[in-house]
């Protein structure tokens, strides 16, 4: 404190910056070294393990009021968060549907946090990079240059963006001004009975309600039945509803089924409906040379939701919404209060990216995607997608070759459902396979999930993992059989 401050009774000014930059630089080197080791040795650790009580108890500690040395803070993080992860970066994590991250993307997230830009808008390099990554997503899916898009938290939000534009375009009234109560005829949205639960949330958030989303039956391959969809549209019009939007699945969450996107695009055009594609699982198959044909027609969509944090393996979180009609996209979200007006030059002369979504403050999500794409090139990511799809076919072959394993159906892309079947049925069979799944997790062998397909209970493997190898799948098949026999012998289930 200088003499003037002291004489005025002023407190010394503080900052969150380190008091010793050399010391924090050396400590940061240690953290980076630990991070490299953490990834390099990922295969040597269990996929997942249960936290002991003393670890859980640490997260009930009260709010800290006084300082703690950074080394102590980092030590606590190492013993807790880093030691008990979800496990999705592990080569044998196939539960739910998650990417496995990548080191370059992690560096991008670190640099984005250091640089600290707010991507709500403005004239700065991060904003331009955000736009460039959106443009790259358009190129990957064959969208026109004139289309727009926005990076968001993930697939659920990307779907909400697309469906909000669809609602406003098809409402026939100014929904932003008058609300959904001003819509003359109730809107109808359509998707298959395999549609992701986020679409229900979207309907509720948009004020339309769950009943506005009509679930259409699927065929034997769990793809939307086009004839049933057409009949539902006719029926709804006759009943006084206004068909507004059809949602096509580029990969369903249960089995990876891909709707006939070309047929849906044609039907939507003929019926005057908005065509939205939920591509959070499979849109990026468009860059995979051996499998791109599976999502043909996605380039005709009015809007698409996709997830770079899945098959581009970006660190969580980053999704992307693309909208063909850029003007409609901006009309749906743009607000220009006096404190966010553009200027002819200076910081506020750049585009306001918040005009394309719900967030005003936005994190710098683009950098982790940009760096990984620049380092590896999009062709490598396409090959990795083909690799995962081939690995699932390999696993399906192992399942078919083992008499005690049963395959639900031939896989479409990178998801396979199967179960251990020693001659049980109903709840006993479900209990056995659930126990197999839990022991695989608890013993740190592999992370699987389970689901219901055609009314039956199945184990589910979703390979969105650039670290998975065929040896891992050999191990999985062996361990499922071993555990199935072990549990049956122990008498934990009965027919």
What are these regions (language model features)?
Residues 125, 158-330:
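Conserved PLP-enzyme active-site core in the AAT-like
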Residues 407-440:
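Conserved PLP-binding catalytic core of the aspartate aminotransferase-like
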Residues 2-3, 7-146, 438-446, 468, ...:
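N-terminal entrance/gating region of PLP-dependent enzymes' catalytic architecture
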Residues 296-403:
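Active-site C-terminal subdomain of aminotransferase-like
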Residues 453-495:
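PLP-dependent enzyme catalytic core of the Aspartate aminotransferase-like
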Residues 137-165, 214-217:
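Short loop-beta-helix segment that forms the pyridoxal 5′-phosphate
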Residues 406-411, 448-453:
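Short beta-strand
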Residues 194-196, 220-221, 251-253, 282, ...:
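Short, glycine-/Ser/Thr-/acidic-enriched flexible segments
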């Amino acid at each position: 404190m200088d003499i003037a401050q002291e004489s005025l009774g002023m407190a010394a000014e503080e900052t969150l910056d380190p008091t010793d930059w050399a010391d924090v630089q050396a400590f940061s080197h240690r953290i980076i070294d630990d991070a490299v080791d953490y990834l390099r040795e990922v295969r040597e650790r269990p996929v997942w393990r249960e936290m002991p009580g003393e670890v859980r108890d640490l997260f009930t500690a009260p709010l800290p009021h006084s300082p703690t040395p950074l080394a102590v803070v980092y030590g606590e993080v190492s013993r807790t968060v880093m030691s008990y992860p979800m496990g999705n970066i592990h080569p044998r994590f196939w539960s739910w549907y998650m990417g496995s991250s990548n080191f370059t993307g992690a560096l991008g997230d670190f640099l984005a946090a250091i640089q600290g830009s707010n991507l709500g808008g403005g004239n700065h390099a991060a904003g331009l990079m955000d736009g460039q990554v959106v443009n790259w997503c358009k190129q990957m899916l064959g969208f026109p240059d004139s289309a727009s898009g926005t990076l968001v938290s993930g697939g659920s939000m990307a779907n909400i963006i697309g469906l909000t534009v669809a609602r406003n375009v098809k409402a026939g009234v100014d929904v932003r001004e008058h609300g959904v109560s001003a819509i003359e005829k109730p809107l109808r949205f359509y998707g298959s009975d395999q549609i992701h639960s986020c679409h229900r949330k979207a309907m509720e958030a948009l004020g339309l309600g769950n009943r506005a989303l009509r679930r259409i039956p699927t065929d034997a391959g769990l793809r939307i039945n086009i004839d049933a969809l057409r009949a539902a549209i006719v029926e709804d019009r006759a009943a006084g509803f206004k068909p507004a939007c059809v949602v096509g699945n580029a990969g369903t969450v249960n089995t990876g089924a891909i709707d006939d996107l070309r047929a849906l695009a044609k039907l939507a055009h003929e019926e005057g409906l908005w065509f939205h594609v939920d591509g959070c699982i499979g849109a990026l198959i468009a860059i995979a040379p051996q499998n791109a044909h599976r999502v043909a027609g996605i380039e005709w969509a009015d809007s698409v939701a996709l997830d770079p944090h899945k098959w581009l393996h970006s660190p969580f979180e980053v999704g992307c919404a693309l909208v063909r009609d850029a003007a409609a996209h901006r009309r749906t979200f743009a607000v220009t209060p006096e404190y966010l007006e553009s200027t002819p030059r200076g910081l506020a002369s750049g585009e306001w990216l918040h005009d394309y979504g719900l967030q005003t403050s936005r994190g710098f999500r683009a950098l982790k995607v940009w760096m990984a794409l620049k380092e590896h090139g999009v062709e490598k990511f396409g090959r990795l997608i083909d690799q995962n799809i081939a690995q699932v076919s390999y696993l399906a072959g192992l399942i078919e070759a083992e008499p005690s394993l049963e395959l639900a159906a031939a896989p479409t892309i990178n998801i396979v459902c199967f179960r251990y079947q020693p001659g049980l049925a109903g709840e006993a069979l479900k209990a056995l396979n659930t126990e197999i799944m839990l022991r695989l997790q608890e013993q740190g062998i592999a992370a699987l999930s389970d689901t219901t397909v055609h009314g039956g209970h199945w184990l589910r493997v979703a390979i969105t993992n650039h670290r998975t190898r065929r040896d891992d799948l050999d191990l999985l098949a062996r361990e499922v059989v071993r555990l199935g026999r072990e549990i049956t012998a122990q008498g934990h289930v009965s027919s």
